[in-house]
UniProtKB/Swiss-Prot annotation:
Biased composition (Basic and acidic residues): 782-794
MF (Gene Ontology): ATP binding; metal ion binding; protein-exporting ATPase activity
Entry keywords, A to Z: ATP-binding, Cell membrane, Cytoplasm, Membrane, Metal-binding, Nucleotide-binding, Protein transport, Translocase, Translocation, Transport, Zinc
Reported cofactor(s): Zn(2+)
UniProt EC number: 7.4.2.8
Protein's gene: secA
Sequence ranges of Polar residues compositional bias: 795-808
Listed name of the protein: Protein translocase subunit SecA
SMART domains, per database record: SecA_DEAD, SecA_PP_bind
Keyword field contains Cell membrane: yes
Amino acid sequence: MANILRTIIENDKGEVRKLTKIAKKVEGYANEMEALSDEELQAKTDEFKERYQNGETLDDLLPEAFAVVREASKRVLGLYPYRVQIMGGVVLHHGDVPEMRTGEGKTLTATMPVYLNALAGEGVHVVTVNEYLATRDATEMGELYSWLGLSVGINLAAKSSSEKREAYNCDITYSTNAEIGFDYLRDNMVVRKENMVQRPLNFALVDEVDSVLIDEARTPLIVSGPVSTETNQLYHRADSFVKTLSEDDYAIDTPTKTIGLKDSGIDKAEEYFHLENLYDIDNVALTHYIDNALRANYIMLLDIDYVVSEEQEILIVDQFTGRTMEGRRFSDGLHQAIEAKEGVPIQDESKTSASITYQNMFRMYKKLAGMTGTAKTEEEEFREIYNMRIIPIPTNRPVARIDHQDLLYPTLEAKFRAVVADVKERHEKGQPVLVGTVAVETSDLISKMLVQAGVPHEVLNAKNHFKEAQIIMNAGQRGAVTIATNMAGRGTDIKLGEGVRELGGLCVIGTERHESRRIDNQLRGRSGRQGDPGESQFYLSLEDELMRRFGSERIKAFLDRFIEEDNDVVIKSRMLTNQVESAQRRVEGNNYDTRKQVLQYDDVMREQREIIYAERYDVITAERDLAPEIKAIIKRTIERTVDSHSQLDRKESLDAILNFAKTNLLPEDTISLHDIEDLNYEDIKDLLYDAALKNYDRQIAKLRDEEAVREFQKVLILMVVDNKWTDHIDALDQLRSSVGLRGYAQNNPIVEYQSEGFRMFQDMIGAIEFDVTRTMMKAQIHEQEREKETESRTTAEQNISAQSTISPQDPIFKNVGRNDKCPCGSGKKFKNCHGRKRF
């Protein structure tokens, strides 16, 4: 272990030496740049662009370009980047993560690589965690970029499509991570290219990169729409039932946070709902509602996992930042179950139209870089998943903060009494204090205790996040006491007020350890910026979540000896700190494994999504007649259908083929059994294809002109693809939920998901081609003028009143296995198509 640590330290030192060498080159241009007039310095941007177009690389331009930004920053902002900031900028340009301590000027550091990469003209995205930071940084740093001749845009959720398009077309675009993801998904749902807002993804520089790429890695971005409303009564009935249960009726697995009914609970459910067998196949839907009601009532906690807003809405609380996640809803009916639990109006369930995780979203950029003060603990994950190195950057001034050893108490009550006493003592001498909590519930409790102790304070949590920046900016003033959940206020510096340095600087008090050492380090990092004095102290108890789930038995046994004598006994030792960090490492390892597994599952969706989105883009941007593609689709559909029917008895086979042709391919009076009964199957394919081409030409002839033909073709394909893709996403979600059970049968769930997901994707492609064929050949096309200016599908869809909504008389198929493909040619299994009634 010692040798490994020594190697890591030596590697870091080697990187710092390389970066120092490049930084000195940049500094070597300082006098030359200082001698330039404003006009000459501004002209450097066009010069660099021309040199880049003539073959010089961005690496070639780096020393001089960084020097230009440095001098421009001094003239425009009154700030001159230090050497360590130049070094951080070089790391960012190389697509890695410079670990820079709080207060070291990450925002200014980013200006140099952002400017350099914007010279290529392909767009640079500066990504922040919230709109306040995006607007603040775009306004402050935008002044510098504009002075240098680069355009700057801000992409906010409230902006219209045209405003978003304008922002993305700028050289530099500031946005939140969520909005970039949603814009990407929405772009792949439009019908016309001119309705897209993004350019191809080039270079993203992510602020607080660990928050976005690690903490939120498992959170999918989902674009969804309403589906047929499930009766709200079932949610209420399930909720009423689980509230009648005692603790003996269900079992909770604390480490995994899962819950299930015991036998006594099952008996009560069968009595309550008047059932013979709760787990009969007919009761699958009911068990789903009961499972969600159990989770809502006994796993999901008010003010920790969610809050109830003044508008009577359930808002999810981000477990890492303590902020509410506006617009997000728990999936699979859990949100509705919580709404029933809390007695607020139940909103309709929704159907996923498109989704993507941040992991796969940001891996699509040509180059990805990020900034943070705490990433070294997650170095393996950044390297393995994002191919990014973590390079620690030296501080401009030595860190003067004092980090005290943890204090461990036997109970929560004793711990909180000690916290309040410490805060009161420091407040009375004028030292500012920032109290960090993990949950809204804890911040409210400490706030009440401080009120009782007569200590004035501010509270920052998910309930009043709108005052975040103002509260944090005042947190360093003399006598200030601020309570904040987790890393609320991250990205806003806490500057010390007059006379505070002499009192020891800002004291950060953590009320419990987080699962991740990185989050604890972020809290500590609020104090001691730019060489300022400061302190940090963590208070723990044996009843804390981390200690309860993962704490060492040695610590518990050691503390038990003192509890009987004194309930306020406290332990302070290096052994304790080591034990806590050991527990955190175990949790971090578990979380990393989980995120890695999520990525393995999501990679299946990613590969399929990229194929579908690439095909969509090709259709949207096509300015050609799509007849060759549509005719090829018709041909493959005919071949697939005839091949699947050729396995049957000859008479039954011909009847099925004829039925397919009449209901999906041709006018009914244009083909009969007499036409195909003497032909072999290859000749039948040729006959049907020739007849289909004639029918295709008849259909197209009804349209007004070539433009109308192209519009009809595009909307037809996109409408079918989008409908099938949406259904496929839901099917994959259901597969993912069920495939875990296959592990009990000694099958690897991920391998099962990959193979089954691939088969389902192939089936979906067949179903898309079948529906395109049927809709093209059977649509009632009206010869009418259509408005060219419309931006929605509605006008074009009026020309596709396809008979896909009409159910023709079901044909009768014999000797078809339940898992065989349906002979009708839909691409679905027989049990899920025409065999549904039979099975």
